[in-house]
Amino acid sequence: SSDLLFLRKIMEQLDALNILIDAGAFSPMQVIVRTLLENTVGLEFILKEDTRKRAAAYYLEQHYKEIETGEKLFARKSEKSKNAIKLLGEAQFTEDSKRFQRKKDAFQHLIDTNELFKEVADAREKAIESKRKYWKKKKRKNINKIHIQWYEIGTNVQNFREMMRETGHEKYYEGIYGGLSYEIHALNAARAIQAVADGLYLQRIRNPQNGGNIFAFVCDFSLIALDKVYKYLDDDEAKRAEFKRYVMDCQKKKVHIIATMDQINIL
């Protein structure tokens, strides 16, 4: 299910973050941390309500994106198809085109034979048509090139900020999510310059300074994701007590580690 897919992505990102923490490479961690936030919020949004429909919308969206890309690539006489033929050759392009058509047919069959997927697919079409009418009313261009995200289907959520509001994390949007975008869009390279008495120097690539804030953020949002999953699974009292002890232990370790990292900043 999609909630398990989210958990897998979160686990992969935490594993990558552990490697970077061990190396003292905190600057590149920001890229993964931002994605971790997106996955954590997405998981919470799915588990909050209408879980089956939202999970289905998330699962289907990736296939929709692949098919949209394939239709552009394999459209005969299009600029993209001409470039693909030059790169792959006519024979390989034709074979890949047939493979794409089989995938497209299989995906449509999956929707047609699954009641939940069919319901979500119909809701998606309605959402696209609704946005097209709105764009037409506002006289916007490219009304036939409507793109929607999985979280828009059957909800009033139109963007990631609104999804953060739905999950109670809107206060983090500007300060954390927006702030982390500097690393994503390569706008923070100048921060690696350190001014000292005798000139300017580049900081070390593996620099532990200011890592405490990133580490704290990773810990907090990882535990938030786990907490939401535990509540959704509705485990018995013994399991909940065990999880509570685990969280308390993590918090103690987090405080100790951050205090140690802050000492590095002071030095």
Question: What residue ranges belong to the model's regions?
Answer:
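Inter-repeat boundary and helix-capping residues of tandem alpha-helical solenoids
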Residues: F6-L7, H169
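Short alpha-helical linear motifs
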Residues: K53-L60, L200-L202, C219-S222
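Secondary-shell segments that build the walls of catalytic and ion/ligand-binding clefts
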Residues: Y64-F215, A225-L267
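Long, hydrophobic, well-ordered secondary-structure blocks that form the structural core
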Residues: A16, F26-K77
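Short, hydrophobic, well-ordered secondary-structure elements
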Residues: L7-I46, E174-S181, C219-L226
